[in-house]
Amino acid sequence: DVALPGRGHGFALHPDHTHAVALARRPGTFATAFDLDGDAPGLTFHAPEGRHFQGHAVFDPAGRYLFATENDYDNERGCIGVYDRADGYKRVGELPSHGIGAHELILMPGGKTFAIANGGILTHPDMGRAKLNLDTMAPNLAYVDMASGRLEDSVSYPEGRLRKLSIRHLAAFNDGRVVFACQDQGQTTDGLTLVGLHRPGSGKIEDLEAPEATTMSLVGYCGSVAVDPAGTLAAVSAPRGNRVLFWDTESRKLT
């Protein structure tokens, strides 16, 4: 096993499947890199002053650079820290996430664009895990060029009650469709649909619906997302509802 300095959240798996990085839960600042054979001690590095990790990262296709979601809390924006594995995970740059509260990011098919779940929630480490902008939060799903940081596309819920759905986790099919899961920051008894499907360039979110009783049982909270290689099924965990749900994304119906 590998000891961590504190509570972790997510992992980034190296493309060769021999190495990984565990990242701190927000507002933690540590990340620990380790080999999966367990023969060498882990290497812990930290986010710079003025930043903290958001629990998720991904390697570039070549496996040299690690891209980690961070909170630039004094400037109230999300960013992506760039860390060089070849130089002991030295931080060598950053990209904008084009939103607030960047959480999970994934590398899209083709290996050149990130999909980023900007949860829309402003936090500051001096306030612990307090959510500071629930009245004005504006989550989005952003597609960002890995090389330049340019925003290629984005989609968000319309103004109003749906803006309280914080986009947190996501996964992409090989054809580029993205499934994402939300956590409701409003009245969870409203029973809003928590899982969406987006086709880049479409400009719209397609709901992956469930029967009302099932939706209510999720208590406004969905977690991780996974998709099958065949391009049909999406799985979403619901920790507060003690279940995992499966959707057929062609029919957009729960299986």
Residue ranges and their predicted role:
Residues 41-109, 120-124:
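Asp-box/WD-like beta-propeller blade repeats and closely related beta-sheet repeat scaffolds
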Residues 2-6, 45-50, 94-99, 155-162, ...:
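Surface loop/turn motifs at the tips and blade-to-blade linkers of beta-strand repeat domains
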Residues 79-87, 131-149, 192-203:
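Beta-propeller blade signature
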Residues 2-70:
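Blade-loop segments of beta-propeller domains
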Residues 69-72, 116-138, 180-193:
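Short, conserved, GDST-rich strand-edge loop motifs in beta-rich repeat architectures
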Residues 15-17, 60-62, 108-111, 173-175, ...:
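Residue-level detector of Asp-centered blade-edge/turn motifs that repeat once per structural unit
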Residues 6-14, 51-58, 100-106, 162-169, ...:
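Repeated scaffold domains used in trafficking and secretory/extracellular systems
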